[in-house]
C-alpha cells in the first residue's frame, strides 16, 4: 500500500480494516524473505508500478509471497498481481534476481477479484521451474505456490517422527492421510512400513505435487485423490472399507 506521504509500504492489515501496518522485519520470518520484500518495494517505485488498494480495487501488486526450502535453501518468490499485464516484466524480474541471486524461481499469480483471498487461480512462471524442493525425514518434497507445507520444518520433523512411533507400522497397515497437502506425512508413512497409503486433498495443485513427490522418492505404495477428505472418508465407511491408521495434520473438528 501507500502511506500518507505516498511512499510504498508493506506489512499486515490492521484488524477489521484495509489499513496496512508497516512491517520491515519479522523475528520469526526468514531474514532473506524480509530483504526480498524490501527490494520488491523499491523496484515498484523504480518501475513506477503502484501497489494494489483493496478499497478501490486499483493498483498492480497485491501481495508478495516468499517460500524457502529449509534444507535446500531454494527460494520461491510469488508476485500476486491484480491483472495479468505485467509492465517491464523481464526487466523487473532481472533486477530482482540481480539483487537476490539466491532466488531459484519467480512466479506471477493473478488475482483480479475483490476478495480477501491472497492467491488467485492463474499463475505464470517467470523464472526457474515454478516450484522449490525441500527435504524432510529422508524424503524430498516439491512445493508449489499454492501447496501447503509446514512452516517450521525442524519441529515438523519431530512431530512426524513421533507420529511414526505411535503408528508402529508393521507392513500390514492401510493408512489414510486425510487433508494430505503435498503428501508429506503420508509418503513418510509409506516409506516407514505402511502396506499402502491413500492421501486425500481438495487442493488440485497440492495433489499434483503429492503425486510428483511419490515419483521423486520412488514410492509406489501411495496414491492420492483430489476430493474433500471428510466426504471421502464417509463414503469409505459407507462402503465398509476400513483404515488401520488415519493421519490428520492438523487434526480437524469432528475427527474424535
Name each model feature, range by range.
Residues 88-256:
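Rossmann-like S-adenosyl-L-methionine
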Residues 1-124, 136, 161, 165-172, ...:
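SAM-dependent transferase fold signal centered on methyltransferase-like domains
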Amino acid at each position: 500500500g501507500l502511506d500518507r506521504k505516498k511512499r510504498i509500504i508493506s506489512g499486515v492489515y490492521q484488524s477489521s480494516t484495509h489499513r496496512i501496518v508497516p512491517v520491515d522485519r519479522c523475528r520469526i520470518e526468514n531474514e532473506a524473505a524480509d530483504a526480498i520484500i524490501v527490494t520488491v518495494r523499491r523496484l515498484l517505485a523504480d518501475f513506477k508500478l503502484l501497489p494494489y488498494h483493496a478499497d478501490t480495487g486499483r493498483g498492480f501488486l497485491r501481495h508478495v509471497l516468499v517460500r524457502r526450502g529449509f534444507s535446500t535453501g531454494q527460494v520461491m518468490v510469488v508476485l500476486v498481481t491484480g491483472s495479468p499485464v505485467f509492465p517491464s516484466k523481464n526487466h523487473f524480474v532481472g533486477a530482482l534476481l540481480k539483487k537476490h541471486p539466491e532466488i531459484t524461481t519467480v512466479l506471477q499469480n493473478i488475482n483480479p477479484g475483490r476478495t480477501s483471498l491472497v492467491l488467485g487461480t492463474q499463475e505464470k512462471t517467470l523464472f526457474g521451474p515454478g516450484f522449490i524442493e525441500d527435504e524432510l525425514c529422508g524424503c524430498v518434497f516439491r512445493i508449489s505456490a499454492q501447496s501447503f507445507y509446514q512452516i517450521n520444518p525442524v519441529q515438523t520433523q519431530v512431530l512426524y517422527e513421533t507420529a511414526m512411533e505411535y503408528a508402529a507400522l508393521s507392513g500390514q497397515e492401510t493408512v489414510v492421510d486425510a487433508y494430505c497437502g503435498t503428501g508429506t506425512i503420508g509418503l513418510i508413512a509409506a516409506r516407514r512400513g505402511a502396506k499402502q497409503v491413500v492421501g486425500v486433498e481438495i487442493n488440485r495443485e497440492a495433489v499434483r505435487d503429492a503425486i510428483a513427490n511419490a515419483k521423486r522418492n520412488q514410492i509406489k505404495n501411495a496414491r492420492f485423490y483430489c476430493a474433500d477428505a471428510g466426504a471421502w472418508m464417509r463414503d469409505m465407511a459407507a462402503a465398509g472399507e476400513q483404515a488401520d491408521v488415519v493421519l490428520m495434520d492438523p487434526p480437524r473438528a469432528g475427527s474424535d
